[in-house]
Regions:
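Pol beta-like nucleotidyltransferase catalytic core
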Residues: 1-53, 58-72, 76, 83-145, ...
Length: 326
């Protein structure tokens, strides 16, 4: 497994190492610790690949083709080259993806889920059941400030939603959290300026636990996936809302209802305007809100939730690479 330098990925790698050793008696190492030509190395797994890697990737050249495996993590708007240029995918003998379009087109590709931030046990603890409806604020959004020129991106749309609710909600009704806000994220913003959100409340510390603990204090969450056009892309954005007992106003990919019951979330596409969306949530009765939470509780205690777990993700990778449980 080639090294990546981000702290979240390091934590993910440590969990993957422990899980593989416990369930498959397989050791997982970063590339600098092994010789890919050795018979002891059964596979070299890349998490995403793009033209940026290809320019200077001396690692892949040393890996026998039959050992090369690729996990396609990001959607088209973040890593377009892996989708539009098959040349990069053809460098690998095994490919894993959640993208249903690729899976239907290439029978050799292997299906995986988009892993969530915690295991089902954490989601099912229901720690926030004691927070009453009357104690909650109206609306929250938690996301990173991003920019993309790709048409599949929802960044422009969700930023428009944030600006609308900042301007039209009553004071204290809407709060924005996340990284990168109130600073430029594109050349045009650096050149012409950018909008400063007065509703911005900063970053949330404590990773996953801090995020859901903060969201638990709100009735609703604006929940826009980074990409809403690729079937199969359902990230932790919606399941984190469920853990926080915060009803998501969800803008996601086609076919979401095949994985998550429609009774658990509000479809952002059903509204003709942001004003219609605001009117819908501000006029919702406590009883109707409780119906959403009841549906969420049913889903959270169903076997379907296991599909979103990191354990399911690890198992799909292990078995797709040919490893067997001991």
């Amino acid at each position: 497994m080639p090294e990546r330098s981000s702290e979240p990925f390091y934590g993910f790698l440590q969990r993957f190492k422990r899980w593989m050793e416990e369930h498959y008696e397989v050791e997982v190492h970063t590339y600098n610790c092994v010789d890919p030509m050795s018979d002891d190395v059964k596979a070299v797994l890349y998490f995403d690949y793009s033209w940026r890697y290809a320019w200077h990737d001396v690692i892949l050249q040393r890996v026998p083709f039959e050992k090369r495996a690729l996990m396609i993590v990001e959607p088209k708007n973040i890593n377009p080259s892996i989708y539009y240029l098959s040349y990069y995918r053809n460098r690998f003998s095994s490919i894993f993806t959640w993208d249903k379009s690729l899976l239907s087109k290439y029978s050799s590709y292997k299906a995986v889920n988009v892993p969530v931030g915690a295991e089902p046990g954490s989601y099912r603890m229901n720690r926030f059941e004691g927070i009453r409806y009357s104690e909650k604020k109206l609306l929250i959004a938690v996301s990173r400030n991003r920019w993309s020129c790709m048409p599949q991106s929802t960044y422009k749309l969700r930023k428009a939603a944030y600006r609308y609710f900042e301007s039209n909600c009553k004071e204290g009704e809407f709060d924005l959290y996340g990284k990168g806000w109130n600073c430029p994220v594109s050349f045009l913003e650096r050149l012409f300026g950018f909008h400063r959100f007065l509703c911005y409340r900063g970053e949330i510390s404590g990773s996953w636990d801090g995020k859901v603990s903060r969201m638990a204090n709100y009735k609703f969450a604006l929940c826009y996936e980074n990409n809403a056009s690729q079937p199969g892309y359902v990230s932790e954005k919606i399941t984190d809302c469920f853990c926080a007992r915060c009803v998501p106003i969800y803008y996601g990919s086609p076919g979401v209802e095949e994985l998550i019951p429609r009774s658990c979330w509000i479809d952002a596409r059903q509204f003709g305007s942001f004003q219609d969306m605001y009117d819908f949530i501000v006029n919702m009765t406590p009883e109707r809100h409780a119906e959403y939470l009841s549906a969420i509780d049913d889903f959270m205690h169903s076997e379907v939730l296991n599909f979103f777990s990191t354990n399911h993700y690890f198992m799909a990778l292990a078995e797709g690479l040919g490893f067997k449980r001991r």
